[in-house]
């Protein structure tokens, strides 16, 4: 159980610390923002972490210090979320850690006839296309810490809009990355994505931006050994590829085993040629005790097999960002019909989670995001009560209240 002196703060201390984390992230931003806009963003991020249940403009007015119209106007303004979140990332991650860019589209439940870009998108939970919205989340993953910071969320146009501009989903995802590639390359030149993105067009698009792709292939992918023989001198085109890889009868003279403590299977790596990707790849083969296999790859053939599997497995940390944003900071809650307000709400939801992770790290808080939100909510209500009532409580009473708040949060985490 977390002791009171561990946080070393009064009732408003946890709130002030959270706001200071949000305020410090502006230090690395080159853009000049007026004080009023900065203050509005900091308060909005705090409220996203404080407000229970549904988070919308009405709730922001109810819990905040501004009117509803002020929040509506704030949500229409442009803000460099990726630069801001990169500052938060630098606080949370160590400079020398292995990092990569993780991308993952996610279905957002939404109804209404006038919501911009509403349509049918694939829902992994439902296993089918459902009516709603989709956002492409772009995050930075720390392979050594097994954590993720969401950098940017971009809404995906519906199929009608994409068809009108002659664009496919893959083309759109590449355009999103193209717009922010300079910032992303500051973090890493590796992009990690799920099997949907293991397409030649996507890998080629990343190549043109200076990225390598780390992903997974279909289990029945057509892969070939690299031909390492000498030219025969015969007429005709020289042999480029070797034999097709038979995963039930691997040629162990052409592959290397990766040491692993996992007794459930074995890992092998080699450079292979992929017919689907139309290129050489660094391939990692995982075979379990039953003989079934999974295929992972990187378009960087100089990447080690160990890194390929570590990078891909860490990709799942972005799923936890989605989970926390959906459960605690209202990723699904925005009822706006303005694409700018939707964009602001999506990104504020993820950024509030990023700041919370830093707060948990600074205080060595061992419990969950749910318990931290409970602590923030209780602290906010008490702080608001004392400020509005004009009461200056005895310091002993305040310390007792702080201990009770922390104990409640720790109890919920148990």
Q: Residue spans of the language-model regions?
A:
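Active-site-proximal, Lys/Arg-enriched surface segment
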Residues: 47, 73-146, 264-271
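Gly/serine-rich nucleotide phosphate-binding loop at the start of the catalytic core
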Residues: 1-76, 80
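Short gly/ser-rich anion-binding loops that grip negatively charged ligand groups
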Residues: 50, 125-128, 163-166
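Short, glycine/acidic-rich beta->alpha junctions
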Residues: 52, 81-84, 130, 195-198, ...
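Contiguous, well-ordered alpha-helical segments that form the cores/surfaces of helical PPI scaffolds
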Residues: 43-47, 137-139, 349, 353
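Generic structural signal for well-ordered secondary structure
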Residues: 53, 64, 68, 81-82, ...
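Hydrophobic, Leu/Ile/Phe/Ala-enriched alpha-helical segments that form helix-helix packing faces
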Residues: 48, 64, 92, 177-184
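Single, function-defining residue in the core of a domain
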Residues: 1-29, 37, 97, 110, ...
């Amino acid at each position: 159980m977390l002791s009171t002196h561990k946080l070393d703060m009064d009732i408003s201390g946890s709130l002030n610390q959270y706001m200071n984390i949000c305020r410090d992230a502006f230090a690395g931003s080159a853009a000049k923002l007026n004080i009023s806009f900065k203050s509005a963003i900091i308060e909005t991020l705090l409220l996203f972490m404080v407000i229970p249940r549904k988070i919308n403009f009405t709730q922001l007015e109810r819990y905040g210090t501004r009117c509803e119209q002020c929040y509506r106007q704030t949500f229409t303004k442009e803000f460099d979320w990726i630069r801001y979140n990169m500052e938060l990332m630098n606080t949370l991650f160590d400079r020398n850690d292995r990092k990569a860019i993780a991308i993952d589209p996610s279905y957002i439940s939404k109804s209404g006839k006038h919501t911009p870009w509403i349509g049918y998108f694939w829902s992994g939970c439902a296993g089918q296309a459902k009516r709603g919205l989709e956002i492409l989340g772009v995050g930075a993953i720390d392979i050594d810490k097994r954590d993720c910071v969401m950098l940017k969320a971009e809404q995906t146009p519906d199929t009608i809009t994409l068809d009108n501009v002659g664009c496919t989903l893959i083309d759109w995802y590449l355009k999103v990355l193209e717009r922010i590639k300079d910032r992303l390359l500051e973090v890493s030149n590796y992009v990690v994505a799920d099997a949907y993105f293991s397409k030649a067009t996507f890998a080629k698009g990343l190549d043109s931006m200076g990225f390598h792709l780390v992903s997974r292939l279909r289990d029945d992918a057509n892969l070939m050994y690299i031909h390492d023989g000498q030219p025969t001198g015969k007429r005709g085109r020289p042999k480029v590829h070797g034999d097709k890889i038979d995963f039930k009868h691997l040629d162990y003279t052409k592959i290397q085993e990766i040491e692993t403590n996992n007794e459930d299977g074995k890992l092998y790596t080699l450079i292979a040629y992929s017919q689907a990707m139309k290129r050489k790849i660094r391939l990692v083969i995982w075979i379990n005790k039953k003989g079934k296999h999974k295929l992972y790859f990187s378009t960087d053939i100089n990447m080690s097999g160990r890194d390929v599997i570590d990078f891909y497995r860490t990709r799942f940390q972005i799923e936890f960002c989605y989970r926390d944003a959906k459960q605690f900071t209202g990723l699904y809650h925005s009822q706006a019909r303005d694409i700018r307000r939707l964009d602001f709400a999506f990104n504020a939801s993820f950024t509030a989670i990023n700041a919370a992770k830093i707060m948990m790290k600074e205080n060595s808080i061992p419990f969950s995001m749910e318990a931290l939100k409970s602590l923030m909510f209780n602290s906010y209500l008490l702080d608001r009560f004392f400020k509005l009532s004009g009461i200056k409580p005895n310091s002993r009473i305040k310390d007792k209240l702080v201990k009770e708040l922390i104990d409640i949060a720790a109890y919920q985490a148990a």
